[in-house]
């Protein structure tokens, strides 16, 4: 089956030196693009989830530094902008990785800075396509694949990680379908994954976050495929809150649990998941829905945006460098020297 070419959510307007972001807060109701010209504006867009997904925010930050350089910013301004962008969201390691890579170009001609940003974008999309090719054979024939949050084209430079595996499987002729967890409270699954897959002609059904265990028990799910925001050296995986619960359920029901992520998500400097900083977001994002408070006034809420899935619950990690199974630490260490 031929799948529609996926959207690219982060673009650079070379003629006007602007970063163009698909506003993911507006989806699925409206396909709206924002045009930004400063690092501050891009950092704010990263923080408020206008652009989200670990690889995508790395690309956005790279282009933010490129636009500053192209508009004449000097080294001091670029270093300050890099620091601001790197702190926009703490859990996703791709952001800091992209900023470090761009920072190495401070002092170079602006054209070189932009070329580096383009390279980060192009390499990410190529990595996603390779992840898809390596992950597709892992998906059982005609399976119903459960995914969480959005790890598709919208979360990357294009094509996607977890949804890249889905896309590649469909392109190879595997007639699979997808269950998309709604993913409270930002509803990345219901709003973004469902929109993206429906747009591309891939069958998708939205679930509430509490349904997965029952459907697993009924034999309606063949495997779980998720993305990642950071993978520790031992194979522990930080991903959207709710991922850990799915991994526990998958293990109980003896279902494969796959993590798909580019190598830039692997952080060998972080020993275990316990060392990964977990972003805490505002409680209003939990108790306010469509402008209406859904919990009694005065009742507090928690919103850790991510959780950590222990490596022992991960069947395999799929990166563009290869597929890693237990023992994950040894496999990741071996891939660190692979090219």
UniProtKB/Swiss-Prot annotation:
GO MF term list: S-methyl-5-thioribose-1-phosphate isomerase activity
Enzyme class: isomerase
UniProt keyword annotations, A-Z: Amino-acid biosynthesis, Isomerase, Methionine biosynthesis
Catalytic activity annotation: 5-(methylsulfanyl)-alpha-D-ribose 1-phosphate = 5-(methylsulfanyl)-D-ribulose 1-phosphate
Swiss-Prot/TrEMBL GO biological process terms: L-methionine salvage from methylthioadenosine
Pathway(s) annotated for this protein in UniProt: Amino-acid biosynthesis; L-methionine biosynthesis via salvage pathway; L-methionine from S-methyl-5-thio-alpha-D-ribose 1-phosphate: step 1/6
Stretches of the chain forming a coiled coil according to its record: none
Listed Pfam families: IF-2B
EC number(s) reported in the record: 5.3.1.23
Domain of life (superkingdom): Bacteria
Active site: 229 (proton donor)
Record: residues binding substrate: 52-54, 89, 188, 239-240
Site feature: Transition state stabilizer: 149
InterPro entries for this protein: IF-2B-related, IF-M1Pi, IF_2B-like_C, Initiation_fac_2B_a/b/d, M1Pi_N, NagB/RpiA_transferase-like
Family, similarity comment: Belongs to the eIF-2B alpha/beta/delta subunits family. MtnA subfamily.
Function: Catalyzes the interconversion of methylthioribose-1-phosphate (MTR-1-P) into methylthioribulose-1-phosphate (MTRu-1-P).
The protein's name in its UniProt record: Methylthioribose-1-phosphate isomerase
């Amino acid at each position: 089956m031929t799948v529609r070419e996926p959207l690219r959510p982060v673009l650079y307007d070379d003629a006007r030196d602007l970063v163009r972001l698909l506003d993911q807060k507006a989806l699925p109701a409206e396909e709206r693009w924002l045009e930004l010209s400063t690092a501050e504006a891009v950092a704010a867009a990263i923080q408020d989830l206008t652009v989200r997904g670990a690889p995508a925010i790395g690309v956005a930050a790279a282009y933010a530094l490129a636009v500053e350089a192209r508009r004449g910013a000097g080294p001091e301004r670029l270093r300050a902008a890099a620091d601001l962008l790197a702190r926009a969201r703490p859990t996703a390691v791709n952001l800091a990785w992209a900023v470090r890579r761009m920072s190495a170009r401070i002092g170079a001609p602006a054209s070189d800075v932009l070329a580096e940003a383009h390279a980060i974008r192009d390499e990410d999309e190529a990595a996603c396509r390779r992840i898809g090719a390596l992950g597709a054979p892992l998906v059982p024939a005609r399976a119903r694949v459960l995914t969480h949050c959005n790890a598709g084209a919208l979360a990357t430079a294009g094509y996607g990680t977890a949804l890249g595996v889905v896309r590649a499987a469909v392109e190879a002729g595997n007639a699979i379908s997808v269950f998309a967890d709604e993913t409270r409270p930002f509803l990345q699954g219901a709003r973004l994954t469902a929109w993206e897959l429906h747009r591309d002609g891939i069958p998708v059904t939205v679930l509430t976050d509490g349904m997965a265990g029952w459907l697993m028990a009924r034999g309606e799910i063949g495997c779980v495929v998720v993305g990642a925001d950071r993978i520790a050296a031992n194979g522990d995986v930080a991903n959207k809150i709710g991922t850990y619960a799915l991994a526990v359920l998958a293990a109980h029901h003896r279902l494969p649990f796959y993590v798909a992520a580019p190598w830039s998500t692997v952080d060998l400097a972080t020993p275990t998941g316990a060392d990964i900083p977990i972003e805490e977001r505002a409680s209003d994002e939990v108790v306010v829905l469509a402008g209406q408070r859904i919990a009694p006034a005065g009742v507090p809420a928690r919103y850790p945006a991510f959780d950590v899935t222990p490596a022992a619950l991960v069947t395999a990690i799929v990166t563009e460098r290869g597929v890693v199974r237990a023992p994950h630490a040894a496999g990741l260490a071996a891939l660190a020297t692979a090219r």
